[in-house]
Structure formats: structure tokens, C-alpha cells
């Protein structure tokens, strides 16, 4: 019978015994079988280890002390990339094993194992790559048990070469000898390859015609090309667009060709040491930058030593370090190079990762392609993170982190959460775990919709998933909602959730909170139960129900979503709502009088209380952004302006209504802003006072709700909390008033995190029935 791990001690394992050990978790593709082999042979144990669709199964036969040492090491010192979730130990009759062997993988009835994320090249492989005496010198696919691609090349489990895109590359005799040698770091490493037998790079022109195939020649040519040209480079999870970040011409050309006037580009640099010559890097940021996950990290600039067009008007810039041999070669003998390294995508779509798609869709943007002949099976954008008060937060959770599982209270059925339509990630729940997908971008195009369907199908295959319940957003126009309806037509149960409730439920689920919280959801939009556009929500919520307790007052959104790209229209609406004369505002906008008439006659002017839209409108009033080209551009510029006057501590006390749901007086706030402008107060000071006013009223409303509902826990979520000033001031204010404050840590606070909340609501609603 199974024996719980904690009960297995030296006293319970007898001399010459046989135990079956079933290990579940991230245990395939991480060197787990070679690790067990070394343990067993080192402790004179006989038996076997095998990958199967349930994880790893070990049979150990030997004396009690030796087996105990093996079990302790499996639990306490697994391989670096492994994550053990469960160990089940069963005592069996002696089998009479004569050796310890690694068996061929099995397919069993249930797929109950996890797939490791892609990680950066390890130090040992890095050193071999640059060692001229090593047979992998300058071989760009150098990898081992502890590093390199995993998720992006796996087509199915169990994890073997035949179920990865390495199946097209039979190992040469030298690689096969390493693969079969238990003492070698590449023992049973499925992506194992070298220049004789492995994948190869090639340099192509913009039409896809091959120019070069020899790697060192390619690298020399690419380094030269990047000075004056835009190059698409195939990386681990898709293509990057790259160019010299110091070149005004190149960066401007990239913006023109990609139709990306403002949105900042990420850069890649050679090292922390070089980065510190122009940025302030905290210890926590260094840790993230150098981690095996290698995310992009938003770092504070001290001085600009590259083109001002890389991240115009912004204090923080996205930075990453090399994570593949190819990328390290870009900086070889050129340590002070700075390259733009941005996802090759079209207007917020997912990253392009198929070669044919790259040649077809990027040829008008790039001058050259650097590609290779190994297929990317699962695309992954670079993850993006930032640090506030030494706590790391996700903007985008993808490469390096997906598809690592999150653990939850057990669900009785398979649940699919479709996520939102912006910054989409979906989620699958089965048993006691959730797999949140990689970043899929915005689902507003046929390309995005098609990839969404394909990615769900891929996840369903590799995780043996068939949804019995689908949870979606309640917005009737979302693609994800329509997708849920399609499944409903095939007999699958569906539940629709309110957007901001899902935001808060996600935080509750992540932190294991079962009691109601004061949930504060600040974002750009979300379909409300009253059919208006919410976005400044104070909810008394758990993972089944919510009560709307407070919000900012409504104002009109002239032209609906078209106003989002024209913040001046929102600013004009705020003036109209307050009765302030708009004659001195937006005088250069040709449509001004037409928009005023639309507002006055209430033609296509949906109501919103969104904090995100309020930020847009205030940025427009201060003259910072009349028109924008990317989401949150106006809000980012308003935050940047506020940073110039961060030392200003004046707090405007926004009035709050007396009855629930409490109304926060937006009109009063706009009047105060215009009054300060009339007095000649600097825009930076007004911007900072606006931030402090939002933080102050947030804390005051939370205090009112604590008094009324006797709740001391606050959950914060929504994309507006990417604002560093607002997050810091609100968290600081709440903690000073002895609230327990919870924020998303394992997922983004934006819509990339709501699928987990949808899972929690779906599970607990189903269990309640």
C-alpha cells in the first residue's frame, strides 16, 4: 500500500527492500533520470527509472540506509530545473534487479506530468561555446541537461527526442556517446547536438534567399549589418527585430516600418557591469536579469547613451541580458554594443515564430533574416518584469516561466478559463493545478484568433485536457466570450464572470485567501453588470460572489473606444461633465466642436468610471498627450511628468458620497486640476498631486469599507497598478493603516492574470452547486 513520504524513515525501510517511487512535477526534460541513475549507482542500489505520462517512476532495491539516502536526495537536492510536486512511495516484493537502468519511456493512461520552461544557457555550456579546444566551440545550439529550450520544442509527452522538434536531427556517434554516458552532463539530454548532426543557422535576404550558412561568417556579417539595417533573428520562442540601438537612423526606420511611433523598445546589453554605466540597477533587478529565466526588466536610466528614439520621454527602459549562444556571440569582442531586441509581431499580435510566416509578414519591415532549421513548436515572447519596493512584478509572463504550474484547491473537473481579449493568456485547471498559457497578445485579428485556437489545442494535447466547464468574461463582444459560446454549443458548461471580479479572485487564488476581501481593481475597461464600462472598482469579494461597494463617478466616453486613442476627447468630456469652459483647451483639434456636440447630445457616448480613462483625460488636459498610438501611452507620460515633482507632498482630498456604492467625486478632482492650471502651477506638480489624490482616496474608501464590513484584507489588481507611483503610495498608505495587502506576484496585474481568477470563480461556483 502507498506510504506517505513523511512516514518513510530508516525505521520503516528494512534491509534489502524494494520500493516503487512515483515522482510528479516538472521532472521531464530537466535531467531527472540521469540524476536518479547517479544517485542509485552511487548508493549501490539496483532497479530502474523511466519517464511516463505520469511523471517519473523509480524502482529502487537495496539496503534500507542506501534507499533512504536516495529518497532524501530526490526530495532535497533535485536537478536545478526540476520542481517536485508529489512523491508517492509503495513497498513491493523483492524483484532481484542485477543493475540500475534507464528504461525506454512509456505512454500510460493519464498524462500527469509537467513541462519545463525554456531557460538561458548555463555557465558550463557558455564556457564550452567559447573554448576553442572544445568540439562545441561556436556551436550555437550548445545545451545540456540544465539549460536551453524545453517548452518551445516539445510536441508531446513523455519527453523524449521523438516528441520534440529535435526528432529531425539524429545524433552523431560523439553526441550519442555523451547521451548514453551516465557520467556525462548530457546524459539523456534530448536537445543534445553538435555542428556535425544538429540544427544550423542561415542568413537570408528580405526575400528569404539564403546568403550564408557558415556560423562564424554569419555572425561577422550580422554584426556589421546591425549597424545600418534591421534584422529579424530567430530566437528560442520566436523572431526578434534587432538593430543598433545607438543608431538614430535605424531606430527611426524601425519605428516607421513597424508603425510604432511611441511604444518603447527593449534593449539587450552584454552584462550588468556595462548596464550600470548608464542605469541604476538594484540588487533585486540584478537577480532577475541574471536568473535562468532571463526576463526583460524595466530599469531606471541615469543617462542616455543610445538613440533617444528607443524609449522616448521615459525614465525606465526594458533591458535583458543574452540567453542563447547566438546572442552571446553578438557581444563577443564588442562588449559595449547595445541592440534593440523587440518581439517580431504586428500591432500587439503574438510573436511570429514560423519561418514561412516570418518571410511573408516581415519582409517589408526587415532587411535580412537570421533563421535556423529547427522548428519552434510553442511560441513564447520574452517575459517582462519590474521591481517596486524590492518586490518583482510581471508585466508579461511568458518565456522562462510558462508552462510552470500554479497550485490550487482541487477542482472536480477540467476547467478552461478563456481570459480576456487584451494581453490574453488562457488557463487550464485539472486536479490541484492550473497551467496559465504564454502571452498571446490582443485577440482583435484573425491571426490572433487562429493562434489562440491552435495554442489551446496544443495545451489540451500535452496536458491531456478536455474541458467540462468553460469560464469566460461577461463582455458580449469579446472573442474569448464567443469562443466559450462555441464550446457551449458542443455541450460544455459555461460560466460568465465580471471582469474586475476575476481580477480580484485571481489575487485571492494566488494567495490562498478564502474569506472576503476588499478588492480594488483599477484598469482601463471592463464590462459591468449595469452594462457600462467599469474600471475603478471597490468590491467586497471572494471567489464566488462580489458586491460593488464604491467607484469613481461616471463620465462620458465620446465615440466609445475610438476615444481611447484620442485622449483629448476624454479630456473634453471631463470638462463638459464639470461645466468648465473649454475655450482654452484643445484649440488645435479640428473636431473639437463636433465632439462637444456629440457629448451634449449624448450620441455614442457610453458611460465609464475607468481610472485608466481618467488618467488619459488628465494627461490630455495637461497637454502631455492629445493622441496616442499604443495602450497606456498617455498614462505613462502622466507618470513620467509626476516623477519630476515626486517630492511634492500636497494631497488633494477628493470628496466621497455618503451611500453605498460610494461615489468618488471625479468632477471635484477635475475642477481642482483646472484651478491649479489657472494658477500657473507646473504640470509636473499637478500630475504628482493627481497621483497622490488617487492614492489618498483609495485608502480612505478602504477604511470606510473596513469599518462597515470588518474586513482587514485588501487585494489590488488591474493594469493601472503597473504605475509605480500609484502602487507604492497606495500600498504604503494601506499598510500604515494596518491592512493586509495582497498583490499579484506570480501573474501580471493586467488582463494577463484574469484567467486564474476565472478558474477560481468557475471552480467554487460549480462546487457551490
Indicate where each model-derived feature is located:
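Conserved phosphate-binding catalytic cores of ATP/NTP-utilizing and phosphoryl-transfer enzymes
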Residues: 276-281, 329, 351-358, 382-383, ...
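Conserved phosphate-binding/catalytic loops in two-lobed NTP-binding clefts
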Residues: 473, 491-503, 712-717, 724, ...
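Internal gly/pro-rich beta-alpha loop/helix module
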Residues: 163, 178, 334-409, 608
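Glycine-rich phosphate-binding/hydrolytic loop that grips phosphoryl groups
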Residues: 500-522, 526-528, 567-576, 742-769
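Short glycine-rich phosphate-binding loop at a beta-alpha junction
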Residues: 232, 464-476, 709-720
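A phosphate-binding glycine/aspartate-rich beta-alpha loop in the early core of alpha/beta enzymes
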Residues: 91, 230, 238-301
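Intrinsically disordered, low-complexity, mixed-charge
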Residues: 4-7, 12-191, 195, 202
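A contiguous, well-structured pocket-lining segment that forms one wall/lid of small-molecule binding clefts
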Residues: 191, 198-200, 420-458, 573-711, ...
Amino acid at each position: 500500500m502507498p506510504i506517505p513520504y513523511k512516514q518513510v524513515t530508516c525505521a520503516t525501510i528494512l534491509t534489502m527492500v524494494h520500493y516503487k517511487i512515483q515522482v510528479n512535477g516538472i521532472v521531464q526534460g530537466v535531467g531527472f533520470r540521469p540524476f536518479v541513475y547517479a544517485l542509485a549507482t552511487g548508493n549501490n542500489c539496483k532497479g530502474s527509472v523511466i519517464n511516463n505520462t505520469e511523471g517519473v517512476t523509480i524502482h529502487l532495491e537495496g539496503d534500507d540506509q542506501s534507499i533512504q539516502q536516495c529518497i532524501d536526495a530526490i526530495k532535497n537536492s533535485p536537478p536545478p530545473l526540476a520542481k517536485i510536486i508529489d512523491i508517492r512511495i509503495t513497498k513491493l516484493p523483492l524483484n532481484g534487479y542485477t543493475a540500475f537502468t534507464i528504461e525506454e519511456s512509456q505512454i500510460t493512461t493519464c498524462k500527469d506530468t509537467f513541462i519545463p520552461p525554456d531557460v538561458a544557457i548555463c555557465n558550463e555550456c557558455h564556457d564550452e561555446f567559447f573554448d576553442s579546444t572544445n568540439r562545441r566551440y561556436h556551436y550555437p545550439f550548445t545545451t545540456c541537461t540544465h539549460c536551453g529550450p524545453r517548452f518551445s520544442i516539445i510536441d508531446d509527452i513523455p519527453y523524449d527526442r521523438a516528441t520534440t522538434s529535435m526528432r529531425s536531427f539524429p545524433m552523431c556517434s560523439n553526441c550519442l556517446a555523451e547521451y548514453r554516458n551516465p557520467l556525462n552532463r548530457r546524459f539523456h539530454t534530448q536537445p543534445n547536438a553538435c555542428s556535425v548532426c544538429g540544427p544550423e543557422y542561415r542568413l537570408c535576404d528580405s526575400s528569404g534567399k539564403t546568403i550564408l550558412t557558415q556560423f562564424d561568417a554569419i555572425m561577422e556579417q550580422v554584426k556589421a549589418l546591425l549597424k545600418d539595417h534591421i534584422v529579424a533573428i530567430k530566437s528560442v520562442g520566436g523572431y526578434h527585430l534587432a538593430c543598433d540601438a545607438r543608431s538614430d537612423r535605424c531606430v527611426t526606420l524601425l519605428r516607421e516600418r513597424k508603425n510604432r511611433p511611441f511604444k518603447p523598445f527593449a534593449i539587450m546589453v552584454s552584462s550588468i557591469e556595462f548596464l550600470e554605466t548608464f542605469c541604476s540597477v538594484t540588487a533585486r533587478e540584478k537577480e532577475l536579469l541574471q536568473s535562468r529565466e532571463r526576463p526583460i526588466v524595466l530599469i531606471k536610466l541615469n543617462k542616455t547613451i543610445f538613440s533617444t528614439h528607443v524609449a522616448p520621454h521615459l525614465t525606465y527602459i526594458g533591458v535583458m541580458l543574452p540567453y542563447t549562444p547566438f546572442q552571446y556571440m553578438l557581444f563577443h569582442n564588442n562588449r559595449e554594443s547595445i541592440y534593440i531586441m523587440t518581439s517580431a509581431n504586428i500591432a500587439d499580435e503574438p510573436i511570429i515564430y514560423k519561418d514561412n510566416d516570418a518571410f511573408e509578414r516581415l519582409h517589408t519591415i526587415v532587411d535580412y533574416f537570421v533563421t535556423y532549421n529547427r522548428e519552434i513548436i510553442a511560441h513564447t515572447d520574452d517575459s517582462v518584469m519590474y521591481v517596486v519596493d524590492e518586490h518583482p512584478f510581471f508585466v508579461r509572463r511568458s518565456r522562462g516561466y510558462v508552462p510552470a504550474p500554479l497550485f490550487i484547491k482541487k477542482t472536480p473537473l477540467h476547467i478552461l478559463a478563456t481570459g480576456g481579449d487584451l494581453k490574453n493568456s488562457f488557463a487550464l485547471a485539472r486536479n490541484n493545478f492550473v497551467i496559465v498559457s504564454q502571452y498571446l497578445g490582443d485577440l482583435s485579428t484573425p491571426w490572433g484568433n487562429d493562434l489562440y485556437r491552435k495554442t489551446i489545442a496544443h495545451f489540451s494535447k500535452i496536458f491531456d485536457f478536455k474541458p467540462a466547464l468553460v469560464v469566460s468574461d461577461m463582455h458580449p463582444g469579446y472573442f474569448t466570450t464567443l469562443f466559450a459560446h462555441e464550446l457551449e454549443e458542443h455541450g460544455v458548461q459555461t460560466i460568465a464572470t465580471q471582469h474586475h471580479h476575476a481580477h480580484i479572485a485571481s489575487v485571492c487564488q494566488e494567495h490562498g485567501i478564502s474569506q472576503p476581501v476588499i478588492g480594488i481593481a483599477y484598469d482601463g475597461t471592463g464590462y459591468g453588470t449595469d452594462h457600462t464600462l467599469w474600471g475603478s472598482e471597490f468590491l467586497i469579494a471572494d471567489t464566488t460572489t462580489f458586491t460593488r461597494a464604491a467607484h469613481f463617478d461616471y463620465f462620458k466616453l465620446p465615440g466609445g473606444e475610438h476615444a481611447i486613442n484620442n485622449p483629448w476627447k476624454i479630456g473634453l468630456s471631463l470638462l463638459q461633465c464639470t461645466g468648465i469652459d473649454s475655450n482654452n483647451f484643445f484649440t488645435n483639434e479640428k473636431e473639437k466642436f463636433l465632439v462637444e456636440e456629440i457629448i451634449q447630445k449624448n450620441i455614442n457616448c457610453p458611460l465609464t468610471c475607468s481610472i485608466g480613462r481618467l488618467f488619459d483625460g488628465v494627461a490630455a488636459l495637461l497637454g502631455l498627450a492629445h493622441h496616442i498610438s499604443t495602450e497606456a501611452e498617455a498614462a505613462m507620460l502622466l507618470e513620467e511628468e509626476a516623477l519630476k515633482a515626486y517630492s511634492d507632498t500636497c494631497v488633494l482630498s477628493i470628496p466621497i458620497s455618503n451611500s453605498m456604492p460610494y461615489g468618488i467625486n471625479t468632477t471635484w478632482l477635475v475642477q481642482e486640476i483646472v484651478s491649479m492650471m489657472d494658477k500657473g502651477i507646473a504640470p509636473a506638480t499637478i500630475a504628482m498631486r493627481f497621483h497622490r489624490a488617487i492614492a489618498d482616496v483609495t485608502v480612505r474608501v478602504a477604511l470606510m469599507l473596513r469599518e462597515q464590513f470588518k474586513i482587514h484584507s485588501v487585494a489590488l489588481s488591474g493594469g493601472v497598478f503597473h504605475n509605480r507611483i500609484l502602487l507604492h503610495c497606495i500600498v504604503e498608505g494601506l499598510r500604515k493603516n494596518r491592512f493586509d495587502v495582497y498583490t499579484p506576484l506570480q501573474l501580471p496585474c493586467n488582463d494577463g492574470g484574469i484567467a486564474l481568477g476565472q478558474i477560481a470563480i468557475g471552480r467554487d461556483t460549480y462546487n457551490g452547486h
